[in-house]
Amino acid sequence: MASSAPSGRTVLITGATGFIGTHLVRRLLARGDALIVLARSPARARRLLGSEVQITSELATLGASTPIDAIVNLAGARILGLPWTRSRRATLLSSRIGTTNALVALGARLEHRPRVLVSASAIGYYGVRGAETLDEQAI
């Protein structure tokens, strides 16, 4: 279980294996923060993020006494490159709204409640780029 880092805070991050998430993880570790990462694939997250972060695949594994100072929610199913079907829309909504609701519920059950929840959709990071095709390499 992550404990508050001596020189920083404990931050829970979803979407930590994406482009913005991996950069955020590096920055927060360099700052001295302790990190808890929620990942669908803990093995992949471990390979990408290293051994300095605590990785969980289920929020339920975090006990009520887990100290979390901040939550950063970058999770969400990929938007670009797939057909815009009814099923896809349901997946997109679930991956964003469902995850956000689960994080709010986690915060409510923690003894040490997070001071902030930041929830972001990473596609906005790229800005307006016209008809240019964007992926995680386009910065």
Regions found by a protein language model. Give the residues of each.
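Glycine/Thr-rich phosphate-binding loops of Rossmann-like dinucleotide-binding domains
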Residues: 21, 80-82, 126-128
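NAD(P)H-binding glycine-rich loop region in Rossmannoid oxidoreductase-like domains
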Residues: 44-102
